[in-house]
């Protein structure tokens, strides 16, 4: 028996929507990264983009456990010597683009390279409850029901 290898033309990509309200950031990010890569499918092939298109809504209502909201820092470099800026998760979540916390969490769980960039293109994160992808008829996935640790009352 030969090892099965999926061809890009054979892959059927689904659209899924996940409501992040009250979900723990890290646990949500691991499940989303698995979906984006296609590792939840029996036809998973490492060199083919066989993952789903994932839509995350209510990203600004995702929660951290412990004191990570105040203590976790995100760094960025401006390009000038000595200009490394840092912001806490709380500052980002209360700022203009709260969806960046989830985007960064998922991005850091995806391999870096050409295929990883394509897979990250299949992720759409929105801070509020609305998204413009109703025409794709996305399937709703309830992450909270998978494990009681996936949610946190905050």
Curated annotation (Swiss-Prot):
Transmembrane segments: none annotated. One of its GO terms (cellular component) is cytosolic large ribosomal subunit. InterPro entries: Ribosomal_uL13, Ribosomal_uL13_bac-type, Ribosomal_uL13_sf. The keyword Ribosomal protein applies. One of its GO terms (molecular function) is structural constituent of ribosome. It comes from the Bacteria. CDD domains: Ribosomal_L13 (cd00392). It holds the Pfam family Ribosomal_L13. GO terms for biological process: negative regulation of translation; translation. Signal peptide: none annotated. The keyword Ribonucleoprotein applies. Keywords: Ribonucleoprotein, Ribosomal protein. Part of the 50S ribosomal subunit. PANTHER family: LARGE RIBOSOMAL SUBUNIT PROTEIN UL13M, RIBOSOMAL PROTEIN L13. This protein is one of the early assembly proteins of the 50S ribosomal subunit, although it is not seen to bind rRNA by itself. It is important during the early stages of 50S assembly. Belongs to the universal ribosomal protein uL13 family. NCBIfam families: rplM_bact (TIGR01066). This is Large ribosomal subunit protein uL13.
């Amino acid at each position: 028996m030969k090892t099965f290898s999926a061809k890009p033309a054979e892959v059927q990509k689904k659209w899924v929507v996940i409501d992040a309200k009250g979900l723990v950031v890290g646990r949500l990010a691991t499940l989303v990264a698995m979906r984006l890569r296609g590792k939840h499918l029996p036809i998973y092939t490492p060199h083919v983009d066989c993952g789903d298109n994932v839509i995350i809504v209510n990203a600004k209502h995702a929660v951290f456990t412990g004191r990570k909201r105040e203590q976790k820092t995100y760094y960025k470099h401006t390009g000038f010597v000595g200009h490394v800026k840092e912001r806490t998760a709380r500052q980002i979540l209360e700022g203009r683009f709260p969806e960046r916390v989830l985007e960064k969490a998922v991005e850091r769980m995806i391999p870096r390279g050409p295929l990883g960039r394509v897979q990250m293109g299949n992720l759409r994160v929105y801070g509020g409850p609305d998204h413009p992808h109703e025409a794709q008829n996305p399937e709703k996935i309830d992450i909270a029901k998978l494990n009681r640790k996936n949610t946190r009352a905050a």
